Amino acid sequence: MAFYSTAKKIVRVLLWPFYKVETEYRAELPQEQGYIMASNHVSDMDPVMLGLAFHKPLNFMAKEELFRIPVFNSIIRALGAFPVARGKGDQAAIDHAVGIVKNGGVLGIFPEGTRFKDGKLHRLKSGAVVIAAKTGADVLPTCIRYEKRR
């Protein structure tokens, strides 16, 4: 994950003038075992910002359409993202996610299935619960909010 940690340092420097990344933990995060980080999804920047906020690398389940963009495909794969065919019960994506969590990794997932900019919580998809049931892993509910640096 050398690419991940290098990219994280570069992105932190580039975004620092514009965004203030703060984290608040209500519980101790698991250090050894894998877990599922389930967050709301309000912006294209969410995976980047969450990656900056967490100490362990996040492996995001991302819509398959993103992997059709040639250069972007290579970058997000190198950062640990993997494709999911939304709305199709993508068993290969579920199996991949289960493997990440069982091997001590952190799965990043947006249970609403897409971005919503209205600030409301929308109907959740079942993926996070299915993966938690298959792995016995904890699900860390996460909320992301954006405020510009003043």
Each PLM stretch: what is its role?
Residues L29, K120-R150:
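A cross-family acyltransferase "interaction/gating" segment
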Residues W16-E24, R145-R149:
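Short gly/ser/thr-rich secondary-structure transition/capping motifs
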Residues L52-A53, N103, A133-D138:
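Alpha-helix C-terminal capping segments
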Residues N59, F82, V106, D138, ...:
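Residue-level detector of anion-binding/catalytic polar loops
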Residues I100-A128, T135:
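Catalytic-site beta-strand/loop segments enriched in glycine and acidic/polar residues
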Residues H41, E64, G113, T142-E147:
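Short secondary-structure boundary segments
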Residues F3-A7, W16-P17, L29-K88, H96:
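Catalytic core of membrane glycerolipid acyltransferases/transacylases, capturing the structured
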